Amino acid sequence: MEQIEFGSKVRVRLDPQTMDIRLETAFGRYASRAEFRPYFIDMEGERVPFSAAEQRSAVRWDCGTGSAARVRLGGFRTEKKRYALEILLQIEVLEQTGEVLFELIPLREAYGEVKKICWPQPLYVCGEERARGFTAMPMMQGMLIPDDCPDELHPFLSTRVCSTECVLPFWGSYRESGFLAIIESYADACLDYHHLPYQPARLSVQWEHSMGTIGYRRTLRVQLFETCDHVRLAKAFRAWTRSVEGLVTLEEKAVRSEKVQQLIGSAVVNTPPVLFHCEPVSSYFNKTDPAKNHEIHSFDEIAAGVEKLRARGLDRAYFHIDGWGKMGYDNLHPDVTPPCPEAGGAEAMRRMLDTMRRCGYLSGLHDQYRDYYLKAESFDEDNAIRNFDGSFYRNDEWPGGEERALCTMLAPDYIRRNYARLSEAGIEPDGAYLDCFSGIELEECYNPMHRMTRRECAQKRNECFELVRSQGRIVSSEEGCYPYVNHLDLLHHAPYVYAFMRVAGVDTPNLIPVPLFSLVYHECIVIPWSMGCRGWGTPERDCGGLHGMLNGGVTMLEFDPCEAELRMSQDLTRLNRTVWNREMTGHRFLGDGTSRQQSRSGVPQPRQPIDQGITMHS
């Protein structure tokens, strides 16, 4: 079968037999490699290469927006099995913009046959050996993988797009020139990656089934750049998402809620859990000191601590209140009311919130509508997410013990119920933190009473966020995953991915953390940063507070911070009050290493841009 060539701004050469591809422009070349070719994975886990297709046709095609190649594949067969799958693969060059679209269209398939389709295969920047090569990945805040990195790296949590290892649906590679790959059909997609020592990283999208079939068109958009770095990639993604999803800035969110305006420049302070109660099956259960499995900090005790912080000079704060429910932190969700009786109950909780308001502070409740505890009063397994094979998510890691996953289709009514009960008791927190929703991967449910696609899961999570906002509260959740940013005011954390790497035993000291997320979304959401060295999610030798300054964020403080942390917190929150509504327009490393960095914030004319030059460690 002959090769197909098409395109003018970008010249594409496709081999329909192998699906090898080459892109050429006036400034660079990008190509797949013969050792990585397309395939799909069936529901039993068997990997079936596209070469197993007994039916294959290819045509060149022209349309109003550009030129394309279409390859039709069917009749897939292995020694064990025949497959009903028939697909159309289309590669189109948009002549106006020079973008390249890779589109997968299912034409025929059987339910429950295909788990993932892995196409297109990885692309690499060709030539340009004089320049050092990098791959940019939106792992939490962002990460660069140098081509010459001596460490091996592969997925350690989940490869699903819009979860911790890929919070934004894109990646990019560059030397002098480079490319950005935008996963437009992000709801049912994974980003597979593998870096071997001293080699360019291999990244590719995997299109996952939705409710048992591929079901709909999947699109990957590739943009090519003559000069490229991580800032160029982030800004190109920002421009794309602004055009398709829009960017809701903090200024717009503050118009909808005066409490968001008060949140700007406020330190985020974690209270100790009002009640920490741990079930014996939990991995947090303390076998050597059983008394630590049931510890109380009364509402009045926390109120006294708040007054001490005010006396020490903390002028603006948002208190994240853990363990306020009847059995404390991560227990009995979603049936957490009434407020913890052992800590003083509803009356004492009202006093605590009144104290926070009197001191000029904001309050927010740590809440949860995903982890569904078997000990919850209203627990019914029929309300839990049911997987494709009929099984349930099962976990007993957290203090509340055994749990399932509450189907997100049902979550909004639990929120309405719980906050109505709190209002009836005179308890009106300024905000609510809905745990897990913006951090864990999108989920499906196969229970016919509340079937849910991953896209519907994202929509229902956003409905929960907007329900909190409609009550006049600050909306908060865990991480900065793409579907949710426009619906959130505050993240609990969005640092670098080191904390999860440490837990997983991944040792990659030669990766380079970069603020990809902040370059896209800085003026759209408030992000707190831990202060000290070895802070949560910061590089081993770096000061977390300095990364906070670089990113123009706010402080994450413990309930009894030292004086140095308080001083740094005041500096950081003052900076945040200056740059909170300004796009982060640039980031660079100063000198030969990575310890000295500079970010740049745009400001409205006639004022001049602000530079934050930061040395991370000495």
Show the residue positions of the predicted features.
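Short, surface-exposed, charged/polar-biased interaction segments
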Residues: V125, T135-M140, E258, G323, ...
